[in-house]
Amino acid sequence: DLAVVAGQCACEAAGITPQSVDAILVSTTSPDSAFPSTACHVQRALGANPVMAFDLSASCSGFLYGVSMADVMIRSGQVRSCLVIAAEVKSRSLDARDRETAMLFGDGAGAVLVVQEVSAHPDAPGILGVRLYADGSGHGLITIPAGGSRKPVGVDTVRASEHMLRMQGRAVFRSAVRRLEQAMIDVLKE
């Protein structure tokens, strides 16, 4: 529901109706259900036309991944506009006893409409630069151990609180700062 409200607000702010959107991309790691996608739920709730609608799971960087993907889809001519939404409901996967982690996460959503500038020169730059990195070697630094197909939620996993978010905060912070610094340097070099 947060994603729907964010999408409505973005469309209203842009002065367009959801029916004129060419694509809907939702970044979330806390979908209401495994499927259909949250983007399809948003599409239906907004009354949007049957257009490209899909989810992206990239956690904290998901919104940036979404905007970058929207830019690529527009530049390739696939779409003229893309509603990009990032929505998370982390409160349901937080262990209140883990104060170091629980205080860092919450629930929220934001959205932006990325559009092709009609009057722009064909070589207009659009988004000037993006550098996105993922580091799979840090897989265990922030995780929800149970709930996927590898380890479905069951009595034992619930007793062990394995359906709750776990994070090694200091290690995540160090990695994020290092990657953010490198991304900024790389973008500025362009």
Describe the function of each predicted region.
Residues 32-35, 62-65, 90-95, 136-139:
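Short, well-ordered, mixed-charge alpha-helical segments that flank or form enzyme active sites
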Residues 1, 28-82, 121:
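Conserved catalytic cysteine-centered active-site region
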Residues 22-23, 80-83, 110-112, 125-126:
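Structural motif
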Residues 27, 57, 82-88, 106, ...:
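Short beta-strand segments
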Residues 6-22, 183-190:
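Phosphate/pyrophosphate-binding loops at sites that engage ATP/ADP/AMP, CoA/4′-phosphopantetheine
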Residues 10, 21-24, 42, 66, ...:
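Buried hydrophobic positions in well-ordered alpha/beta secondary-structure cores of metabolic enzymes
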Residues 1, 98-174, 178, 182-185:
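Condensing-enzyme catalytic core mediating Claisen C-C bond formation in acyl metabolism
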Residues 75-109:
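Flexible, glycine-rich active-site loops centered on histidine and acidic residues
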